[in-house]
UniProtKB/Swiss-Prot annotation:
The keyword Transferase applies. InterPro entries: SAM-dependent_MTases_sf (IPR029063), UbiE/COQ5_MeTrFase (IPR004033), UbiE/COQ5_MeTrFase_CS (IPR023576). One of its GO terms (biological process) is methylation. S-adenosyl-L-methionine binds at residues 57, 77, 101-102, 118. Keywords: Menaquinone biosynthesis, Methyltransferase, S-adenosyl-L-methionine, Transferase. Belongs to the class I-like SAM-binding methyltransferase superfamily. MenG/UbiE family. It catalyses: a 2-demethylmenaquinol + S-adenosyl-L-methionine = a menaquinol + S-adenosyl-L-homocysteine + H(+). It comes from Chlamydia caviae (strain ATCC VR-813 / DSM 19441 / 03DC25 / GPIC). This is Demethylmenaquinone methyltransferase. Pathway: Quinol/quinone metabolism; menaquinone biosynthesis; menaquinol from 1,4-dihydroxy-2-naphthoate: step 2/2.
Length: 230
């Protein structure tokens, strides 16, 4: 039985995975997420405050304030356990925490210049509403950065190897490392089922964002988009 993609099921799953979430990201990215996080931070650029959506345990936000020491970050996630780990891990970091749904942010209209979603786009039940909400809270010409685990193009030589890794090795590692085998299966499937770039980029356009930067990593296994509000 697969997990559904409704909010309560996903929230329960991520709460249960919180203690092992960073290890899971290492498995899904073959350890390359550390490099991608650094690249993402640099591509986001300097801002007084980063609004880190789907923040997880705060690794991307911490990378950001490491790169830009005068900045602060607001971490938003619907998993209280994820935020609890971030609070415990970075007690002295200039972080503010909001437990909530990014499709209904308790944030004023046009109040932020920079937002980011890392490894969370594929888990959003309603990407259209989430993008519209982010557009609402960004100032004119504000930016949204997205870092996501994606797939090589269908005709790429690494496409088959990537599919086999997600289909067989990730669930196997999940069985060995965790009691929550179903969650590992879901996370692998979420990468496979993420729509292609053309579809996602039309969503961005429909939500009144334009692409200012885009970069692929590891033959397309990860993608960064920097979007500007229009």
């Amino acid at each position: 039985m697969q997990l559904s993609t409704n909010k309560p099921d996903l929230q329960e799953m991520f709460d249960s995975l919180a203690p092992k979430y960073d290890r899971i990201n290492s498995i899904l990215s073959l350890g390359m997420h550390h490099l991608w996080n650094r690249k993402f931070s640099k591509m986001l650029g300097k801002s007084e405050c980063l609004l880190d959506l789907c923040s997880g345990t705060g690794k991307v936000a911490y990378r950001y304030i490491h790169d830009y020491p005068k900045s602060q970050a607001i971490l938003v996630d619907f998993s209280s356990n994820m935020l609890a780990i971030a609070k415990q891990r970075y007690p002295k970091a200039p972080f503010t925490f909001i437990e909530g749904d990014i499709a209904q942010l308790p944030i004023d209209q046009e109040s932020h210049t920079l937002a980011a979603i890392s490894y969370g786009l594929r888990n959003l039940p309603d990407r259209k509403n989430a993008l519209n909400e982010i557009h609402r809270i960004l100032k004119p010409n504000g930016c949204l950065g997205i870092l996501e685990l994606t797939s090589p193009s269908d005709n790429h030589p690494m496409y088959l190897a990537h599919r086999l890794y997600l289909k067989f090795l990730v669930p196997l590692i999940g069985r060995l490392c965790s009691k929550n085998k179903q969650a590992y299966h879901y996370l692998a499937e979420s990468i496979k089922n993420l729509p292609k770039d053309d579809y996602l980029e039309q969503l961005f356009k429909d939500a009144q964002f334009q692409i200012s930067k885009k970069r692929k990593f590891a033959f397309g296994a990860a993608t960064i988009w920097i979007l500007q509000k229009i």
